[in-house]
Swiss-Prot record:
It is linked to Oculoskeletodental syndrome: An autosomal recessive syndrome characterized by congenital cataracts, short stature, dysmorphic features with coarse facies, dental anomalies, multiple skeletal abnormalities, and neurological manifestations. Other recurrent features include hearing loss, secondary glaucoma, and nephrocalcinosis. One of its GO terms (biological process) is insulin receptor signaling pathway. Residues 1266-1292 are annotated as: Activation loop. Keywords: Acetylation, ATP-binding, Cataract, Cell membrane, Cytoplasm, Cytoplasmic vesicle, Disease variant, Dwarfism, Endocytosis, Exocytosis, Golgi apparatus, Kinase, Lipid metabolism, Membrane, Nucleotide-binding, Nucleus, Phosphoprotein, Transferase. This is Phosphatidylinositol 4-phosphate 3-kinase C2 domain-containing subunit alpha. Residues 861-1037 form the PIK helical domain. Residues 2-142 are annotated as: Interaction with clathrin. Residues 19-31 have a biased composition (Basic and acidic residues). Belongs to the PI3/PI4-kinase family. It comes from Homo sapiens.
Amino acid sequence: MAQISSNSGFKECPSSHPEPTRAKDVDKEEALQMEAEALAKLQKDRQVTDNQRGFELSSSTRKKAQVYNKQDYDLMVFPESDSQKRALDIDVEKLTQAELEKLLLDDSFETKKTPVLPVTPILSPSFSAQLYFRPTIQRGQWPPGLPGPSTYALPSIYPSTYSKQAAFQNGFNPRMPTFPSTEPIYLSLPGQSPYFSYPLTPATPFHPQGSLPIYRPVVSTDMAKLFDKIASTSEFLKNGKARTDLEITDSKVSNLQVSPKSEDISKFDWLDLDPLSKPKVDNVEVLDHEEEKNVSSLLAKDPWDAVLLEERSTANCHLERKVNGKSLSVATVTRSQSLNIRTTQLAKAQGHISQKDPNGTSSLPTGSSLLQEVEVQNEEMAAFCRSITKLKTKFPYTNHRTNPGYLLSPVTAQRNICGENASVKVSIDIEGFQLPVTFTCDVSSTVEIIIMQALCWVHDDLNQVDVGSYVLKVCGQEEVLQNNHCLGSHEHIQNCRKWDTEIRLQLLTFSAMCQNLARTAEDDETPVDLNKHLYQIEKPCKEAMTRHPVEELLDSYHNQVELALQIENQHRAVDQVIKAVRKICSALDGVETLAITESVKKLKRAVNLPRSKTADVTSLFGGEDTSRSSTRGSLNPENPVQVSINQLTAAIYDLLRLHANSGRSPTDCAQSSKSVKEAWTTTEQLQFTIFAAHGISSNWVSNYEKYYLICSLSHNGKDLFKPIQSKKVGTYKNFFYLIKWDELIIFPIQISQLPLESVLHLTLFGILNQSSGSSPDSNKQRKGPEALGKVSLPLFDFKRFLTCGTKLLYLWTSSHTNSVPGTVTKKGYVMERIVLQVDFPSPAFDIIYTTPQVDRSIIQQHNLETLENDIKGKLLDILHKDSSLGLSKEDKAFLWEKRYYCFKHPNCLPKILASAPNWKWVNLAKTYSLLHQWPALYPLIALELLDSKFADQEVRSLAVTWIEAISDDELTDLLPQFVQALKYEIYLNSSLVQFLLSRALGNIQIAHNLYWLLKDALHDVQFSTRYEHVLGALLSVGGKRLREELLKQTKLVQLLGGVAEKVRQASGSARQVVLQRSMERVQSFFQKNKCRLPLKPSLVAKELNIKSCSFFSSNAVPLKVTMVNADPMGEEINVMFKVGEDLRQDMLALQMIKIMDKIWLKEGLDLRMVIFKCLSTGRDRGMVELVPASDTLRKIQVEYGVTGSFKDKPLAEWLRKYNPSEEEYEKASENFIYSCAGCCVATYVLGICDRHNDNIMLRSTGHMFHIDFGKFLGHAQMFGSFKRDRAPFVLTSDMAYVINGGEKPTIRFQLFVDLCCQAYNLIRKQTNLFLNLLSLMIPSGLPELTSIQDLKYVRDALQPQTTDAEATIFFTRLIESSLGSIATKFNFFIHNLAQLRFSGLPSNDEPILSFSPKTYSFRQDGRIKEVSVFTYHKKYNPDKHYIYVVRILREGQIEPSFVFRTFDEFQELHNKLSIIFPLWKLPGFPNRMVLGRTHIKDVAAKRKIELNSYLQSLMNASTDVAECDLVCTFFHPLLRDEKAEGIARSADAGSFSPTPGQIGGAVKLSISYRNGTLFIMVMHIKDLVTEDGADPNPYVKTYLLPDNHKTSKRKTKISRKTRNPTFNEMLVYSGYSKETLRQRELQLSVLSAESLRENFFLGGVTLPLKDFNLSKETVKWYQLTAATYL
């Protein structure tokens, strides 16, 4: 039916139809008799042929082509050849009515013409229905031909299933003749809807069971037009044959969308001129029964069997549309093709219908037989299962190495750990020993040696013991140390050393170790089933159609049909039938085919017919034709309602099959005998038709006026061409709303140029309705089009066949509505799924992408040294760049040109592949040859090849091969990136999937983490189907025990999520009650099960400690969940469970910090970072590990009032409270310095914002850490139009106070700066790694990481192109900027105001006073008889301050005791008394402001008197006040009170009074030389000395001597009021050669800048440069002396 151009390259197949021979004349009666005999003979012949073929397809293309070349001869040949000649010249349009009626009986009128397309090729379910009918609105893949009696022809070798535009550049020849055939063409469907739909990835597709023949019509188009014209003559009208208006309307509708069910067009109505043969119909609505009639037979029809109806008017029927700017009209003639549908009606509806017709042809399958097809897997799923089954056999349950049944403790490599001179105390519990065995060992000792030491206590002769059969289990956890690793490399041991806790282990044999997660023999024998174990997994996306729900809907439908056919009043029953149909369509994603729409309309019209007319209408099926139908095994309908229901039933079954088959491979369905053509030889352009979007919500209709699609074609994450925009259309309404485009999209690219991994992206946009007032967006009139959703489709399937046929693509979209059911997302959006129908061409051959033959010959590697210096330098500069992200087009072209010079720089492979100009088939052979000869990459380098920039399957497969060298522990750390990389895999069964599943089979920790990551990824609707398959494979191969454990964890998370939701929704006062009641249900879960913790599977909980469970008062109201450890030697398990917040970003930030910490540890830098675990267990919910003994900075600061954030001492004094001894405090301060340095670097590099004192925490051991990473990558929280985070990172004065040990800078601050700069430079060396890790997380849907642009912050923060010295200077300036930022303190203050909540005394577990760790009462300490302020002392700690000695005499004591309190501590006592007793009259506190200095003797003397008076008044106050716990705690002696050295200290203790002229101190310098320039970096100076003891204002001045003119003078900035300044400034001397510098000396002087007097000298040093090796950097401390200076 299509017009085909001459440029296709396919051979023409001219018609071989012979001229009919002339026979003798016969009269009409004899002719009719001959016709009847011929029909009977043809029926018999075709029945025999069908039985022989069994509806099987032909075995070869050659055989099929021969069949196509046969002509379907006329049944009879009449001798009127002369009349035929004359008929050639007859102009039908000019004949009178009488001549037309006379011509009707002239059998010679139908002359020999080019035959109409008689048959179609063997089709898959995705064929285009346009081959059989031509609707007046285009719905296929190709534009229609020009109107008029065009001849549509197809060559036998290329039986195209779609029509095409005459002038389209597709390579087809419109002059090719047709290929008639006597062979029936078999369809895989019982009927064709005018358009039909498929889902993208049906989990349970249908398989067509029967095949149906289509015969060549024996009446030409011209004859059909003639007969139609005769039917409108006056004589015909007189005989009562004029059609009613309804019939005419139905005819037009039929021409627009002719159903394949409508093959039974009236055969004899137009021929019967007897007015008595049929009743006269006047102004009565009568159905066109011949359009509704379902004929079930393979017999040949009347010669006029396939007459085509003509469109009544060009205006109504010749619909035009534009394609590429040109108006095209649809062909005016349509035909039924005599498509004899075997419509078996189900027994419920018509019980007397047989399942097969007399010819043995399969009927329409029953509901049961058809729905059995739903449960059949498609071929890609089956291939994946086979692959997983093969993988599973490589890991038998008998292999203990890959199936230990328990978890291994993770390890982290540390530099020089084997040589580390550190010892630890280890306690090992051994069976049979009451007490543990305790001994000291080196952390560098292997676990196997530790086991041998422990066995020495048990066995006298170790030679008789198999040491390898023993393991060391961690007490309190179900994990085992790895015998072949050092003890100190295990993370558990590192944490014990970090927290200074006891290392407790348990010695067990393998047999005694709990192995309840091991796979068994039964697991190995169980077949792989991807869907069997997913029933308990929460699936956020709507599942694909399955058998049972659809079966129920079909049963309901047939029940309604049976009822409608039995009762007298059919109107209400038919309404129920239509409702049942609507439910079926709704279950199929709201897809309603046009066949269903038209069938429903006809059913409504049929039920409205008067009963007096029913018999008349029924008679149309009676008489001679009735007996004929019965002999063919077809149902003879009794009334129009039954006919319409039959047609509706067939349309429903069509939709079921089409819905199930969509998305399957062209070779999935049916043993296709299509020929195969290689893609690289195919010159046709890529094209497809966007037909419609189904399932549109009513909210869209009101909110959006028009819709359009942006179609883009991408590869390697980039568009191959400029995206194409569809036309803008509105919505239509039948059962449901739909958007209809029916538009042909053509990409200007030949199929031969498409890479294998090409992906089609369709993005739906909506134009807001300007007049609608219901939109929630008040500013919508000013907004542009909204992106509503996006869907992607690979152009080649997993077998590398080009996609074809109709596809249903699931497009998920967010909408501003709460009324539509769907998946609720964050910020009030609702996820809606609509179905996008796209029609691809279905050619007669399958187009397959074949991999080019790789040249295995050795590539000639070029020597880089042979290049010219400038070219070599340019190439090296490119190779040394941190990432391919910064390469320009010129750089990429240059690098690709010089790629053969780069073999000795293997790490540059990602840059080279990213620079490839294209990935066309013709260029792949050379690229693959280069790839296979490239040296192997390190796993972390090869990780970049899994990014979206590298879609090629060969590249990704090789990358996985290199990554296989990664250890299990490293893989566990990087698992989130690998899970996201699955999105970039083009097919399900990829090397990456195989790699992850193989590692999961061998390591329980990997399997556990992979499960939770995959489960969380199910919420990504665009990839949820793929993740379901991988998750199903993981559960299938992991074994029953592991699967049951994971499902228990899932159940626990669901229960906790329900509790958290209830508590969150409850009012503040009722929350505790709700919590306690809800936790009882969780406790009942633990009564049946022990459960491993999702955060850490080595922790096993056996019950809840409900009394200890509580909730936090933040906005999300997270729960504090306390569980009892199943291991009696373990501690309680405390976690936080949170709902309402997306924890995935927190997971990513903590993952990056953990990787940073491991990088530092590998380089020997232990910054004592606090790494806690966080796990997202679902959408906006998750679990977080609680760090014990820690508080927020806000909670610490507000103990000193709401302005505590502006004070310097709160942190230091809080640490002193928990670390009272000097040794403990020094250790805590050191922990603070190291951990604070790590936090500063990590938060800056990651751009972590929204930092305030409620998300920075401090542990009592001094470790500082950050929580709550809702803002990162530089996306700062805004305060109006200003950023709340004004400083590069948080470093406040109270932190500096702890670092310095006081208010003034000390050498400890220099240590802090050095730690920061060292850590920063180590991370800078791994810039590419962090960019790759973050880049792989872009598709995860994190709100702050959506594109490559978000990575720009990290790249800029790491300064990859700078030297280490320059980076050190840069970060030093950041430290100075952060330390001097008043904005941070103000931010803290604002947060204190917002969060401060005082409600009486703190809870029992909180200290009542900031300087006392516990609360005490007079019952414990005894009542106080006398109290007074005895004296005061001056102390230094390290700053000068006064402490007041309080004399206390208690009842029963003879000797008084003394406690020492500061003025601030007295003030804290009074403030908290005021809070506890707001209605009591308390004594006045002496808090008047003191002008000038406060820490002087005069002020202390006055305060002593005032404080003594205050205490006397307090003790004489009411008993409730004087004897409260707060007062008792204040007077309770602390450790500092009991230390003798704390009673008094010399006034000048710690002070330094130098003798006149004394010089002291040292300077730290970095000296290097490169590119003709000498670099002097002045880093630190320590221990400077001044004559008067005052703090100087030091700066550094240098000269290169000799220098008579002082031209070499360089100076640093001035550092104010410090003896230990940090400069980190670079002094540069350019233009000096090494020979010149060897003759020079560097003179360095340190001076103090004074404003009121002359600068004075603090010390200096002279360094001869000849003593330095200028080829490398020298970093060293130099002692300052009293040298002369310029």
